[in-house]
């Protein structure tokens, strides 16, 4: 379970993209199948630099085990947490503190939290943070410490790299602030609705996603 955007981010960089099948219980990435791929890749000297796991339907994958694999095989984790804004693993909110280099949340209207469109990337890496700020604004910088031309006026800027226009407007920000106040109630209501569906569909020949009761999403 993934989305084209997760693969596209690698293709934008000229990377080779490969896929790992899901665990039939959690619907998240199968770490057993990933281990097998990593073992083969290690022998072939073709280990991945990045793994992009998904917290499908807000249900977090096994962060602890994937972090151990990342240390063993020296890859970074770029987490697609599009569905998981407000998710807790145990008592900890989903964040880069749990092992990912970057955690990306979507603010699309069908997600738990919305600003009509857009999203946010969280990181504890200062260099990544500065690059993200640059890429969201056409690759432009105004920080005097990083400018080549030190004789500049207040209007002066330099383009360091190719970038995009990912700036959030004021209307979206205002909507997001209002949504933040309701986020916990939104997630509680979704859990209540999920329990209703599960209890009324038990007799059907359906397979449901396993959710660790210690987690909340």
Please report, for each region that a protein language model flagged, where it lies by residue.
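Hydrophobic/aromatic ligand-binding patch that stacks against planar heteroaromatic rings
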Residues: 8-10, 69, 171
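Structural detector of well-ordered beta-strand residues that form the stable sheet scaffold
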Residues: 18, 77-78, 104, 207-209
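PLP-dependent aminotransferase class I/II
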Residues: 32-36, 44, 50-54, 59-65, ...
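Substrate-binding/gating loop at the entrance of the active-site cleft, primarily
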Residues: 1-31, 110
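Active-site phosphate-binding strand-loop segment of PLP-dependent enzymes
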Residues: 25-115, 120-128
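Short secondary-structure boundary/capping segments
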Residues: 9, 91-96, 111-112, 163-165, ...
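Phosphate-coordinating loops and pocket residues in cytosolic domains that bind phosphorylated ligands
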Residues: 12, 96, 134
């Amino acid at each position: 379970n993934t989305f084209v955007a997760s693969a596209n981010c690698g293709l934008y960089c000229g990377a080779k993209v490969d896929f790992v099948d899901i665990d039939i219980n959690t619907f998240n990435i199968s770490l057993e199948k990933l281990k097998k791929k990593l073992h083969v890749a290690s022998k072939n000297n073709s280990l991945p630099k990045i793994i992009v796991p998904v917290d499908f339907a807000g249900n977090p994958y096994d962060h602890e085990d994937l972090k151990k694999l990342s240390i063993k095989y020296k890859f970074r984790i770029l987490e697609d947490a599009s569905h998981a804004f407000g998710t807790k693993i145990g008592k900890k909110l989903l964040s880069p503190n749990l092992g990912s280099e970057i955690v990306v949340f979507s603010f699309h209207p069908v997600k738990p939290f919305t600003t009509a469109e857009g999203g946010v990337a969280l990181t504890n890496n200062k260099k990544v943070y500065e690059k993200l700020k640059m890429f969201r604004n056409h690759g432009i910088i105004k920080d005097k410490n990083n400018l080549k031309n030190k004789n500049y006026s207040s209007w002066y800027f330099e383009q360091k790299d190719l970038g995009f226009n990912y700036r959030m407007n004021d209307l979206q920000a205002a909507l997001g602030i209002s949504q933040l106040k309701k986020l916990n109630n939104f997630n509680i209501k979704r859990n209540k609705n999920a329990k209703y569906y599960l209890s009324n569909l038990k007799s059907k020949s359906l397979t449901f996603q396993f959710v660790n009761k210690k987690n909340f999403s």
